[in-house]
Amino acid sequence: MVAIAPNPHSGQSVKTIRENLLTPRFYTTDFEQAAKLDLSRQQEQLEAMLAEMRADYNRHHFVRDDSFKGTWDLLDAQTRKAFIDYLERSCVSEFSGFLLFKELSRKLKDRNPLLAEIFHLMARDEARHAGFLNKAMMDFGHAMDLGYLSKTRTYTFFPLPWVLYTVYLSEKIGYWRYIIIYRHLEKHPEHSFYPLFNYFERWCQDENRHGDIFKALIHSQPQLIQGWGAKLWMRFFLLTVFATHTLTVHERAKFYEALGLDATAFDREVIAKTNETAARTFSVVLNVDHPEFYSRLQRCVEISNKLQAIEATHQPKWLKALRKLPHQLAIAGHLLRIYLLPPVNAQQEWGTVH
């Protein structure tokens, strides 16, 4: 289960997190619409995935071993801060998934038993992940008070189709983040400064499995992949997830540097792999090979750094907001230009929708 409160000897209990556009949100959705989903087109696939989830291949994986008994005081202050921020946001993201899946399972229990059990088991996985990350933070004198957060943070309503798109992408991009870091450290163990990374290979299997479940849910609803409206939304959410990833990775560049990774190269590999994976689910994906794609994302990073510099000043809030506005509009302009780039027709590679 999720660790709600820290060990009293482990240090500071964190009850709030720094809120900005990159902070993971807590979501709610249209449970009535979810209960009415016709899953017949993907019934066989979903039942097979449910059997996998019941098998619970990772039931014994998230157990801390003796490697966690070391000391991490040798990390420099910048790397330590960036790593704690990484753990904190990752923990909140996993806990957000737990809350959403748990509520979906509860609401659907009597009306859509198949989907209810799937969400129940996905909530189990997310709880494990959040709890494991929270224990990692305790090693650095921090811990999230997740119970407090669940009661006090604002929940954002997302229509069900948005939930399906975004959670699918979140799980798949999470898979690629974990496996790329794991494979890199497998080749360069000298950069593995904390034992959490040894768990990423099996961990990412949960992310991949969850993503496959959401792929089946999306494909069970043809209106989510067909028609111009659906294609515009798919492009929008791909861009939103990729832009958020780019800004977040570069904000934590010191963390990736400590792992022996170049933040920009890592970001681009994760985006390329996720876009390639999404092409098996979405009927259109972004053209990440277009020369403007990464160059405009990089400009967003540079502008974001200026926004952070403004926020760090002691000026009045109204003046900060005024100074930020042209930079925020500039980021919006770059993202709009990326969005308007001709997309890639992924569906032509499938043959037929199934």
Curated annotation (Swiss-Prot):
Cross-referenced CDD domains: ACSF
Enzyme class: oxidoreductase
Keyword line: Chlorophyll biosynthesis, Iron, Metal-binding, NADP, Oxidoreductase, Photosynthesis
Recorded metabolic or biological pathway in which this protein acts: Porphyrin-containing compound metabolism; chlorophyll biosynthesis (light-independent)
Keyword Metal-binding set for record: yes
Molecular-function annotations in GO: iron ion binding; magnesium-protoporphyrin IX monomethyl ester (oxidative) cyclase activity
Keyword Ion transport part of the UniProt annotation: no
Cofactor: Fe cation
Family affiliation: Belongs to the AcsF family.
Function noted in UniProt: Catalyzes the formation of the isocyclic ring in chlorophyll biosynthesis. Mediates the cyclase reaction, which results in the formation of divinylprotochlorophyllide (Pchlide) characteristic of all chlorophylls from magnesium-protoporphyrin IX 13-monomethyl ester (MgPMME).
Protein name per the record: Magnesium-protoporphyrin IX monomethyl ester [oxidative] cyclase 2
Organism this protein belongs to: Thermosynechococcus vestitus (strain NIES-2133 / IAM M-273 / BP-1)
Upper taxonomic lineage: Bacteria, Bacillati, Cyanobacteriota, Cyanophyceae, Acaryochloridales
